[in-house]
């Protein structure tokens, strides 16, 4: 996935899902491939199914699962953000932060320096910004800046 070999990543995810239908890592991988390919409808469907599955089956002491659930909400928020559904994005960002704020803190400084032209906002920063902007009259809102939004990163729990 990190090497942008999306076809291979999707095949591996589907193979894992054939063996274990609700494999959360494979579901997240599949969603991240779809987001990377701008297939937002498909990504949203996978993330929503992952969220439903995790909310029904997650144990309180499953830190990886909790991080995956937070990342699923954060990534679904990113999709909504990119589709200009800012209220929906804010709800998903807030849910992600409430579940596990550390899991969606964003990339470290080294990753930013090596990979991004602009510093990507964290889920927390984006949620605060959206909340602030949504309080303003519609004609005063600045909800999207294409150049900065392009650098928004997806959230990957653990290694995918």
Residue ranges and their predicted role:
Residues 1-160:
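Alpha-helical tetratricopeptide repeat
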């Amino acid at each position: 996935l990190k090497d942008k070999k999306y076809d291979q990543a999707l095949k591996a995810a589907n193979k894992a899902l054939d063996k274990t239908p609700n494999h959360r890592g494979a579901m997240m991988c599949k969603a991240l491939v779809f987001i990377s390919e701008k297939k937002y409808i498909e990504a949203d469907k996978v993330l929503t199914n992952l969220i439903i599955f995790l909310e029904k089956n997650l144990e309180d002491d499953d830190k990886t699962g909790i991080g995956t659930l937070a990342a699923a909400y954060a990534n679904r928020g990113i999709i909504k953000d990119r589709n200009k559904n800012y209220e929906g994005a804010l709800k998903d960002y807030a849910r992600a932060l409430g579940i596990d704020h550390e899991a969606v803190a964003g990339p470290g400084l080294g990753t930013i320096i090596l990979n991004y032209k602009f510093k990507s906002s964290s889920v927390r920063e984006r949620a605060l910004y959206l909340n602030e902007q949504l309080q303003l009259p519609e004609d005063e809102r600045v909800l999207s800046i294409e150049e900065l939004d392009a650098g928004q990163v997806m959230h990957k729990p653990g290694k995918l």
